[in-house]
Amino acid sequence: MAEQNAAPLLKVEGLKQYFRVSKSYTVKAVDNVSFEIYPGETYGLVGESGSGKSTIGRSIIRLYDPTAGKITFDGQDISGRLTHAQNNTLRTQMQMIFQDPMASLNPRKKVEDIIGEGLDIHHMYKTKEERRDKVEKILAKVGLAPEHAERYPHQFSGGQRQRVGIA
C-alpha cells in the first residue's frame, strides 16, 4: 500500500518521444504522457500493441533520450543529459523486466552468473563469497531458494524464470 503523504518515487510529466524517419516525416511514438508512481505502489501501463508502452519504459530508464518532458526519479531530475556516473547509478536502481523471460536469460549460464553479472559490472562485491551471498539474498527477495543459483534457466517454470529476470 502506498503512503498517502509520500513524494512520488517516479514522476513523468509531459513525456514526448519522437523519432525522425525522414526529413519530412516524424513518428510521434509517445506524445504528452504524465503519471506518478509512489513508494510501495504497483503501476500497470496498459495499451494495445504499438501504443508506446515499451518506448515509455525505455525513455524513463534512459535507453532513449526523451524528445521533451520531465522525468523525476527519487527526487532527482533525470530528464537532461546525464554523466556516465549518473547513468551507472541509475542503472543500479532501475531495470527493464521482459515479458518473455527466456528471451532475456542466457541459457548457457547458471542463474548465479546471470544475477551476478550486474554485480560484476557495478563492482558490488570484494570476494567470491560476498558475491555468492548477494546473489542468494537477491534470490530470496524474489521468493527463490539459494540452491536455485546452481540451475540453468530451462530448469525453471515460467513463473520462476520471470522471478529470475526480476532478480
State each model region's role.
Residues 1-167:
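ABC transporter nucleotide-binding domains
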